[in-house]
Amino acid sequence: MTSSVWQERRHGEDKQRRNDHRSPYQRDRARILHSAAFRRLQAKTQVLGVGMNDFYRTRLTHSLEVSQIGTGIAAQLSRKYPEHKPLLDSMSLLESLCLAHDIGHPPFGHGGEVALNYMMRHHGGFEGNGQTFRILSKLEPYTLDFGMNLCRRTMLGILKYPAPQSSLFIAGNHHEITNHRQLKPSQWPPVKGIFDDDNDIFDWVLEPLSAADRTRFTSAQPSIQPNYPHLRTQFKSFDCSIMELADDIAYAVHDLEDAIVMGIVTASQWQQDVAPTFEHSNDPWIRQELADIGTKLFSHEHHLRKDAIGTLVNGFVTAIIITDDGVFEEPLLRFNASLEVEFAHALNVLKQLVYKYVIRKPEIQMLEYKGQQIVMGLFEAFASDPERLLPLNTQERWRASEQLGLNSHRILADYISGMTDEFAGRLYQQLFTLRLDRTWS
């Protein structure tokens, strides 16, 4: 079992509830599951434009699937590496991370994220994972000032990019625009890190680490991703590495399933882009089990497709290993979960297939662009006269931020990023369409 310091909460609690024998991480899971931010995921589409019927996944169903895969990974690692069972002592912890991992993502997917990042370009930027950290630690009203007040280890596990944005930002790589309609996502990629407004919580999370561990954990280097101008962090905690693998598997496999059912990805595209990788893999299991899996995936027999999806998920989950960094002192940082090389390559091929034929599909990009315009329009309107247009409770937060000399624009980003796709679209119509909405008496 890990040190008890990782079970501490930022705001001490002394709640004595009748016959409540839950562990700290079971309480964390309950707080996330019952939060308004989690419920809103049911109205945020996982992939814009695939919602033509009731089959498609939302961010909520995606998060549930990530949770199921994440606990499956932990279970098989516990059997494979009994010496590491102390690190895998709570399934509730991993469920918490997987359920919460998308909570901070704004309406309209990447389009909404880029739009908010642009509108916040002079006020600390915006990025979905940073917003998740902020919701859990400050915004969700489980407590007055400490958000959900989750355990320190839970907060460590949600840190996909453990460094303040200001330490990662590289200036001079952005293109100012004269009109919102000219905004290109490739020119305004978000800095992947924690908002500087939340450095106090970030410092608290990392408090138990030695100086050497903290310096290394928060270090960054130039990204290997083409055309990404900012620095990228290099390390994640053990729990975060499991959550991220579960997210990647769900994205690559389950989003692919949606695309196949909708007819967005075809059998010929599979044969061209994926089948050769499986057929010529250096791993015998991939060659034997996955070489002809496309036949089942694109079958009109529903049960055959589901069997193929299950085979893919099982293959990736059981190919995950624990690696030893050998440098970090803290076990939660020293050990990480990762995929065997051939399976990592196979998963990346599936992710690229989804990106190429689904995410980059012009019809889907048009919807993302439309969402981008909605978010920028809303932000511009609220920023022009916050005390006139914001809801009363958000006005109060904005005024308090102004009075304390804090970043009041962050309050606008908090409000808009919490909207669902439908609510944001409806609000945009109320503000900008010519039709009078006679909702007053």
Swiss-Prot record:
One GO biological process term: dGTP catabolic process
Q: Which domain of life is it from?
A: Bacteria
Give a GO molecular function annotation for the protein: dGTPase activity
- Basic and acidic residues: compositionally biased ranges: 7-27
Residues of the region (Disordered) are 1-27
Indicate yes or no for the key word Hydrolase: yes
Domain HD: start-end pairs: 59-252
Q: Which keywords does this Swiss-Prot/TrEMBL entry list?
A: Hydrolase
Please name one Pfam family that this protein belongs to: HD
**What PANTHER family is this protein classified in?**
DEOXYGUANOSINETRIPHOSPHATE TRIPHOSPHOHYDROLASE-LIKE PROTEIN 2 (PTHR11373:SF40), DEOXYNUCLEOSIDE TRIPHOSPHATE TRIPHOSPHOHYDROLASE (PTHR11373)
Q: Which family does it belong to?
A: Belongs to the dGTPase family. Type 2 subfamily.
- NCBIfam families, from UniProt? antiphage_dGTPase (NF041026), dGTP_triPase (TIGR01353), PRK05318.1 (NF003701)
What name appears for this protein in its UniProt entry? Deoxyguanosinetriphosphate triphosphohydrolase-like protein
UniProt organism field: Shewanella oneidensis (strain ATCC 700550 / JCM 31522 / CIP 106686 / LMG 19005 / NCIMB 14063 / MR-1)
